[in-house]
Design a protein with these regions (language model features):
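Transmembrane alpha-helices
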Residues: 1-68
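Non-transmembrane, membrane-proximal soluble domains of secreted or membrane proteins
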Residues: 33-40, 57-94, 98-100, 105-367
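Stable alpha-helical elements in mature extracytoplasmic
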Residues: 132, 305, 309, 414-417, ...
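Conserved hydrophobic/aromatic pocket- or pore-lining residues that grip, position, or stack substrates
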Residues: 141, 174, 238, 402, ...
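Sec/Tat-exported extracytoplasmic proteins
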Residues: 240, 317-320, 340, 422-425, ...
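Periplasmic peptidoglycan-binding/tethering modules of Gram-negative envelope proteins
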Residues: 353-432, 506
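Periplasmic OmpA-like peptidoglycan-binding domain that tethers envelope proteins to the cell wall
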Residues: 404-416, 426, 432-506
């Protein structure tokens, strides 16, 4: 129905225009062609001058009235170090193009009036060549363009400095795809691992990260809805790429904008200089940000209180283009370090211990050893300090490994957790524990009982060899009788093959 009404309106307007044209022709015949033409020319000339005045005033007024809603003006000053320089370049460019804009429009409409046809003897002036005029419109734009380009090159070099291995910067990676961004942070080593598109597995490795590269195993990957967190006053280098179509990595408040092209990695370097909290306080000083964020809830939070930095895709990439918006939060460096330390590496949560883990049974990484040591220390301390009886006395030794199908202890990998257990036993001299061995239900129950006994005994022998008093230790195998998970799946059977620390007395 809406389309039908719109079509009818357009049709009626066309009829009106045609009828006005016919009336003009009829009027010209009655009044005389020359007089009518002179009248029309005068009317149009004056109308064009009036339009020029109204148009230029409207342009200047609207620019001034809405300046606080444009990037670079009012409260929307740059939130990055380089952004101030870019805003200055835009202002300089606006100054020169504004002069051309105003002069061009004044001449355009004034000449339309001045050189309107008044008499049949009037003729347009024509000249084929004017050296002075050609020099002016060649040299002046060339000088202005040279100045603008030179300033742009200087700014470009300032924005993209050479970052060496000793540069104290944070390198992250943004991968665009329909319709989200995956953001990868380096772990404790400060390095992003390698990627290879041939390793992409939509179910388990959507970025194609090479897990054989040790720099990859502590990398942190944020999914499509996780908040992106950045530190204030720290240099950030963003690797930008895409998996499917052309995207664009756009952080408007930081003056960051770079295409994300499949197969062609790009990058951008910037330094945030205002936290999200500081930018909100800046916005709060302007009346247009003091209105309710939700007009339907006048008593709710103000607009400035709900402000968030954002990452957008500035390339029309498909019907879900709008959903690529991500929240960006800038915090102080200490808060960022705390947040980053709380994030678990993708490898640990999604790859470690699976059949496609290239390091299974081969290596423990420093961040794993440290995290497990803290976890074991916390578990024991929580039980010893518990007065409610809710803390579990059973603590799984997650980094104790054996040869497949054997009771032989893999000392190279198990030593880290067991040595830390020795330290905790020394810290708590009254602590007595039982080492409990468990298996899955593969094979017969009697063999599993023997295997679990032997494995628990080998752990006990290791602890004794490190000087732990034998009176504080005991070992027992429980075979397949106490499963944690169902033995119907490989993951369940793996969870049931374990060694536990059972606290007997505090």
């Amino acid at each position: 129905m809406t389309y039908l009404i719109a079509f009818a309106i357009i049709f009626l307007l066309a009829v009106v225009v045609i009828q006005i044209g016919k009336l003009s022709e009829l009027s010209a015949r009655i009044r005389g062609e020359e007089a009518e033409e002179r009248s029309v020319n005068n009317t149009q000339g004056m109308a064009l001058v009036a339009f020029m005045v109204v148009f230029l005033i409207a342009c200047v007024w609207s620019a001034w009235a809405y300046k606080d809603q444009m990037l670079g003006y009012g409260p929307l000053t740059s939130a990055s170090a380089h952004g101030f320089e870019l805003d200055h370049i835009f202002n300089v460019t606006l100054f020169f193009t504004g002069i051309v804009f105003i002069i061009t429009h004044i001449l355009l409409f004034w000449y339309s009036y001045k050189y309107r046809k008044v008499n049949n003897t009037d003729k347009a002036m024509f000249f084929a060549h004017d050296t002075k005029l050609e020099m002016i419109w060649t040299v002046v734009p060339a000088v202005v363009m040279t100045y603008l380009v030179a300033n742009g090159l200087i700014a470009w070099n300032n924005i993209f400095p050479t970052l060496g291995p000793d540069s104290k910067h944070i390198e992250i990676e943004a991968t665009g795809y329909q319709f989200a961004w995956d953001i990868r942070y380096p772990g404790a080593d400060g390095k992003l691992g390698n990627k290879d598109f041939r390793l992409i597995d939509p179910a388990n490795n959507s970025l194609g990260v090479d897990w054989k590269d040790e720099a990859s195993v502590d990398d942190i990957i944020l999914g499509g809805s996780d908040k992106i967190v950045l530190p204030k006053d720290s240099t950030i280098k963003v690797r930008i790429t895409a998996k499917d179509v052309l995207h664009n990595f756009y952080l408007p408040h930081f003056r960051v904008k770079m295409d994300a092209v499949p197969g062609l990695p790009t990058s951008f370097i910037f330094t945030p200089v205002k936290t999200t909290k500081e930018f909100r306080e800046q916005l709060s000083k302007f009346p247009e940000w003091q209105v309710p964020a939700d007009p339907a809830d006048p008593t709710g939070p103000k607009k400035w209180e709900t402000f968030e930095y954002e990452l957008a895709c500035a390339e029309l990439c498909g019907k879900g283009h709008y959903s690529m918006r991500r929240i960006v939060e800038v915090v102080e460096r200490e808060e960022f370090d705390t947040w980053l330390a709380s994030q678990k590496p993708f490898y640990v949560t999604n790859i470690r211990g699976k059949e496609y883990d290239p390091w299974a049974g081969k290596k423990l990484f420093p961040f794993e050893i440290k995290a497990r040591a803290n976890e074991l220390k916390s578990d024991i301390a929580n039980y010893l300090s518990d007065t409610t009886g809710t803390a579990s006395r059973n603590i799984q030794l997650k980094h104790v490994f054996y040869a497949t199908g054997s009771a032989d202890l893999n000392s190279d990998l198990s030593k880290y957790e067991l040595d830390h257990l020795v330290e905790l036993m020394a810290k708590y001299p009254s602590l007595k524990v039982e080492l409990a061995g468990h298996t899955d239900n593969v094979g017969d129950a009697a063999s599993n009982q023997v295997l679990s006994n032997s494995r628990a005994g080998n752990v006990l022998s290791y602890l004794l060899s490190k000087g732990v008093n034998s009176g504080r230790l005991s070992a027992k195998g429980y075979g397949q009788d106490q499963p944690l998970e169902s033995n119907d799946s490989a993951e369940g059977r793996q969870a049931n093959r374990r060694t536990e620390l059972r606290i007997i007395s505090k």
